[in-house]
């Protein structure tokens, strides 16, 4: 009996020590009703002792966390809040979309890192948010088993837990992606996600659409190949793109932001560069014929084939011969860096303003590869979903002003690049061949600008002549393709 009493006394003291140790390691503790609990941290014995059950604040009612705007790279310090995907009181899970923000370079979707309830939004639409400052307050979810007795909580095997997670897992996708899928009658369960943890991205939906039969309605070949004859000059009436704004008699002042703010910064730096201009005329008659032959083949692969892939590939072949045009200079023009990759930018006119995504590594891409990438960039650009990667890292730029209707331009270099080309519209103009015969020629004008601090006129002229020869005689490109 003495031995039993001694063991009971030792056990009671040990239990108190364990309680005290547990109490000291748990901050912000609440006291609940007395209960029996087994401290599983000591496997050598099991001990049940009446005491006040302990629980942390976070486990009791959830902890409010300030979700801050993290660094999104490229030296971006502030962004504009363009759209909220949540409101106060909404429940969110990890990787759910919180909002869409726009910097001076790209639009970015911010996703949650926590499971919980939105308690506060710090910004209204079009407000400026700063990196490192709170975006929202999220009350994290309390643990469901935190109020249960540890002794009575059944252990779940690893296999059972895994099975329940897989069975109950929901498809990961942002509201914008779900909306796009719904508009095109696509079941998200049929789409393979390429994002983190199988998240379905907008590119996955677009790729799924391209692979489906009839997902992209083909235009009538007759309409494309045999366009209706143009109206006489005297009957041509300019069509207004949009209605003129109604004059209210009041001036309106608003801040410059988004892509327009980026243009202010870039163009201000660009105009410090001494520009050298060079113009030429390109006969694209043979290229027009070649494209008409290749369009049905590209269309069968689900790709729209424009002239731009040929322009980009010809430029890349020219840059191999004149690498100084694929270079960049530092701010004070003390050092020049010759770029190994040909990341050729394409100026695009969008509702948000001028953006310049670029096709990466054109030097190792085929015409079809370039066309595929251009299709992707154009689709993402039309819905303002281009990533920062798509919009940065350019080494050379082409601006297709002719798609709007221009013939000549004076393009402005995008620093730190050293050259840019502007392409005019293609027009049918009478020209003489080598026999002196008049024929219908497809003429396009090109306007080049180069940084005259490092590029001389002869270099720009030789590059343009080489680029011109590839386009006027497309078969020549076959000799240099790699």
Curated annotation (Swiss-Prot):
Start and end residues of each stretch annotated as Critical for association with PPM1K: 145-160
Enzyme class at the top of the EC tree: transferase
Every Lipoyl-binding domain range: 64-139
Cellular component aspect of the GO annotation: branched-chain alpha-ketoacid dehydrogenase complex; cytoplasm; cytosol; microtubule cytoskeleton; mitochondrial matrix; mitochondrial nucleoid; mitochondrion; oxoglutarate dehydrogenase complex
Location of the region described as Disordered in the Swiss-Prot/TrEMBL record: 147-168
Active site: 452, 456
Name recorded for this polypeptide: Lipoamide acyltransferase component of branched-chain alpha-keto acid dehydrogenase complex, mitochondrial
